[in-house]
Amino acid sequence: MNVNEPTVFLDMDGVLVDFFGAFAKLANVEHWKQMDSQRLQGVLDKIVGSDYFAKLPKTNACDSIVEMVIDFAGSYSILSSPLRGDITNSTKHKRAWVMDNLSPQPTTTIIVRDKSQYALLNGVQNILIDDRGNNIHKWQEAGGYGVKYQANKNDLSVISRALKAYKREKS
């Protein structure tokens, strides 16, 4: 990959990994937002220290997203956040998930709370595809190009259009 080309970073939970569907199933609810904060914390407590993140299913769009990004940039990287209160363990199991579920493998896998530090590298505006609006906002404030995409709500055309728009802006 050319050093002047952007790195496309893919978030895991909500983009490649069906964290929220699996979480709702674990909690025995249709949607995680149906839980009050106490019940939500109780389910999160069950995850802490476990291999939960290694066993999650792919989203239906996972492989198509990886393929689309490789067609666009030649490669991709993972940029995901660890679970608060279980950073070391959740990081280990997210890395295991990447090794077991993604092919071809990403160039790099970064698990960190503050994603925005990767928005600009060597003067290049990098791309983040993430389901959280707050992450996209911080990414764009740091100079990166953000694409808000939620696998259980959005069509793949959201990513396709955004990548085409990025290319038009840079040409």
Which residues does each predicted region cover?
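Active-site neighborhood of HAD-like aspartate-dependent phosphohydrolases
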Residues: 1-50, 141
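Conserved Lys-Pro-Asp/Glu-containing loop-to-beta segment of HAD-superfamily phosphomonoesterases
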Residues: 7, 109-139
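Short hydrophobic segments within beta-strands
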Residues: 11, 79-81, 129
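Short catalytic/ligand-binding loop motif for oxyanion handling, primarily in non-cytosolic enzymes
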Residues: 17-20, 25, 76, 85-89, ...
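Substrate-recognition element of Asp-dependent hydrolases with the DxDx(T/V) motif
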Residues: 53-58, 62-92, 98
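Acidic carboxylate-rich catalytic motifs and surrounding loops in phosphoryl-/glycosyl-chemistry enzymes
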Residues: 80-84, 109-117, 151
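Structural recognition of alpha->loop->beta junctions
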Residues: 94-110, 165-170
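Acidic, Mg2+-coordinating phosphoryl-transfer loop and its flanking beta/alpha structural elements
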Residues: 126-165
